[in-house]
């Protein structure tokens, strides 16, 4: 069921990666541009927060859109450069990477603007 939901979200953006659910994944999700593959942590339904799952998938969708728009090799190069800059500034390669920050902001904006049931209420906030 979760795979169908992920596929439906990604289809909205005309994204069609290989979708893998992995119980042992050490992060919520990750996108592998070279293989056009997204791996989502398979959390049991009773422990899944639907909003968090949506935002996670949207976050990865932004990476896919960036890779498609820039080209995979250029995206990977820019991502690595941003990670190196973060480390040089004594920050975290992943968490402080500008591509991760942009993807997270975009995911929240998309969720509130399109996917959320109460999107009309959040537009004015």
Predicted regions and their residues:
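Short helix/loop segments within enzyme catalytic domains
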Residues: 93, 106-125
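Predominantly extracellular/secreted Zn2+-dependent metalloproteases
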Residues: 18-22
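Zn2+-dependent metallopeptidase catalytic core
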Residues: 1-16
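OB-fold/S1-family RNA-binding modules
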Residues: 29-33
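N-terminal first-folded block
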Residues: 25-27
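Short pre-active-site segment immediately N-terminal to the catalytic Zn-binding motif
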Residues: 38-57
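Short active-site segment of divalent metal-dependent hydrolases/proteases
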Residues: 58-62, 66
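Post-HEXXH active-site segment of zinc metalloproteases
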Residues: 51, 55, 67-101
């Amino acid at each position: 069921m979760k795979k169908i939901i992920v596929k439906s979200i990604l289809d909205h953006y005309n994204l069609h990666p290989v979708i893998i659910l992995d119980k042992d994944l050490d992060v919520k999700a990750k996108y592998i541009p070279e293989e056009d593959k997204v791996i989502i942590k398979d959390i049991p339904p009773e422990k899944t927060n639907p909003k968090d799952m949506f935002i996670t998938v949207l976050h990865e969708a932004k990476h896919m859109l960036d890779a498609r728009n820039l080209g995979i090799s250029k995206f990977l190069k820019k991502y690595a450069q941003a990670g190196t800059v973060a480390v040089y500034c004594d920050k975290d390669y992943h968490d402080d990477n500008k591509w991760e920050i942009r993807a997270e902001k975009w995911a929240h904006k998309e969720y509130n603007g399109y996917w959320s049931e109460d999107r009309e209420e959040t537009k004015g906030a």
